[in-house]
Amino acid sequence: MLRANAAMRSLLGSAAFAVDQPTVPEMEQTTLDAGWTVEPSGALLLVRHRPKCMHDIPAEALGGGEYEINDVYVSLDDLGRESVDFLPRAASRGLYFARRMLASARGLPGSETLLAAVAIHVDVDDEDFALQGATIRFFSRRGSYPDWFDELETFTLEAIAVLDMSDVRT
């Protein structure tokens, strides 16, 4: 079930959130098209993000290892940062990408515990704001895994949403 902090809830409630059908830039589309691989250890990794030389992630560290590798930057450059609807559209794109990747993992061993954390930088006064994209990280709740998403309101400079398989439309 989707959980979101106040900043993300604000973006989701905006009329601009549903302005258009979300799109995915070409580079991220290749990540969607390539899909997932299941490592011998059971780790769920994005094919395009899997290191060429990689040691197995131990069972006791599966979620944390997945989190480090399944780190996707989704460009927002084409959305027009000066536009009033930029942030809601950025959230829409990030959530759309996360749902598509979760859907493509459905049925893989361990996917029932797979989560997607979507982050959109909302501090418009930050000098690096124009460089920010959407960050989506995928990890399972197996072994040690990031627990800092348990309390989303601690994130004040980012709109954060955490999705699981129940958020994927069939």
Task: List each model region and its residues.
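N-terminal leader/targeting segments
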Residues: 1-68, 72-73
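Generic alpha-helix signal with a bias toward terminal, lower-confidence helices
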Residues: 20-24, 48, 79-86, 126, ...
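A short linear-motif detector with a strong N-terminal bias
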Residues: 23-25, 52-53, 94-96, 115-117
